[in-house]
Amino acid sequence: MRPNIHPEYRQVLFHDLTANTYFLVGSTLKTDRTKQWEDGNTYPYVTLDVSSASHPFYTGKQKQIGKEGQVARFGQRFGQFFNKGKDKS
């Protein structure tokens, strides 16, 4: 293998801002920010908006849209095109 072409693999501290959860994971991600972890060591620090701790699929808090709602929304958007030839009485 050629020297000096591979990225540096190290432990990185990820912070999910939505769930306020920290993950210590091996990564090659580059960052200038550092933060001290609960074990006393200082690690590179990266913030996340969504992770497995806050994503609806993993938390089980999914929002389902009913079929009736989708049909009603379609009617609101495109109903005017289907009612052109009909009398409004």
Swiss-Prot record:
GO (cellular component) term, any one: ribosome
Record keyword Ribonucleoprotein present: yes
Keyword Nucleotide-binding tagged: no
Keywords: Ribonucleoprotein, Ribosomal protein
Single Gene Ontology BP annotation: translation
Pfam families for this protein: Ribosomal_L31 (PF01197)
A GO molecular-function annotation: structural constituent of ribosome
Subunit and interaction comment: Part of the 50S ribosomal subunit.
PANTHER family in UniProt: 50S RIBOSOMAL PROTEIN L31, CHLOROPLASTIC, LARGE RIBOSOMAL SUBUNIT PROTEIN BL31C
Family that this chain belongs to: Belongs to the bacterial ribosomal protein bL31 family. Type B subfamily.
Listed HAMAP family: Ribosomal_bL31_2
Stated name of the protein: Large ribosomal subunit protein bL31B
Lineage: Bacteria, Pseudomonadati, Pseudomonadota, Gammaproteobacteria, Aeromonadales
